[in-house]
């Protein structure tokens, strides 16, 4: 398996999620009190500096290190798009004549920044591994979401370990992504970002799962959620990983 195969699988999973209207379930899980309690260490009485206007901010102490938790609210997950992006300019998606066209080599190539031959080869590898099949009713490619989640939870951080770099402008990822309702970052403001000239934040450069990820997520809101959560799993410890897996599971329509 190659990293572009993982990108393709999550893109196709995002198409399934859009068909099944799963965005609300993912947002509900990310906003749940259970998740908030899992993420919340012992609170200390300290007024944090910084933060954006209108953003709830609290500082906690965990293992001797300050951690800043941000809570962001999205009132209209399906209809309102302000605030979910981590970049400064919108990127138009290619127009499609029908829903099934989104699964075509042409559409997947345009949305992911891969050539048609790369998409075809990637799909062949995914079919061989059992991660991609054909839907019985529609005949369209269908992701084995449960197995993809297992691989993401237990294997991706070892197959594709995180490579961090210098401070750069970029697109927030992990729990720092604005597509999520909460984020964790150090008190010094060092958040993980995918390097990108249009990024809205400065943070520590994190090499994306595949080089075209920063452009691909600008065209697909749910894909941004998915890949930010994948990075939270790759970057985080057992607790953060558990939270991210729970949100991702809900967003993929799994029980």
Which residue ranges define each predicted feature?
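Short, cationic-aromatic polyanion-contact patches
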Residues: 80-91, 104, 134-166
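Short, amphipathic alpha-helical interaction segments positioned at domain boundaries
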Residues: 143-188, 204-206
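Mid-protein regulatory/catalytic core that forms ligand/cofactor-binding pockets
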Residues: 179-255
């Amino acid at each position: 398996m190659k990293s572009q195969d993982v990108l393709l699988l999550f893109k196709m999973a995002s198409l399934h999620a859009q068909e099944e209207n799963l965005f609300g379930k993912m947002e509900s899980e990310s906003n749940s009190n259970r998740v908030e309690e899992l993420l919340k260490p012992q609170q200390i009485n300290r007024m944090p500096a910084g933060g954006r206007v209108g953003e709830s901010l609290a500082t906690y102490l965990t293992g001797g290190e300050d951690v800043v938790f941000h809570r962001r609210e999205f009132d209209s997950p399906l209809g309102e798009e302000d605030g979910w992006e981590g970049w400064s300019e919108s990127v138009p998606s290619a127009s499609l004549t029908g829903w099934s066209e989104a699964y075509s080599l042409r559409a997947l190539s345009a949305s992911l920044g891969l050539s048609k031959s790369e998409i075809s080869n990637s799909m062949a590898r995914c079919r061989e591994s059992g991660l991609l099949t054909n839907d019985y009713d529609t005949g369209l490619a269908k992701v084995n979401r449960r197995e993809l989640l297992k691989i993401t939870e237990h294997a991706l951080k070892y197959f594709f370990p995180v490579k961090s770099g210098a401070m750069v402008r970029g697109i927030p990822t992990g729990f720092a992504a604005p597509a999520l309702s909460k984020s964790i970052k150090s008190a010094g403001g060092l958040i993980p970002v995918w390097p990108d000239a249009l990024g809205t934040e400065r943070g520590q450069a994190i090499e994306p799962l595949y080089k075209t990820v920063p452009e691909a997520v600008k065209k697909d809101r749910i894909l941004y959620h998915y890949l930010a959560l994948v990075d939270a799993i790759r970057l985080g410890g057992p607790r953060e990983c558990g939270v991210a897996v729970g949100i991702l599971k809900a967003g993929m329509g799994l029980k």
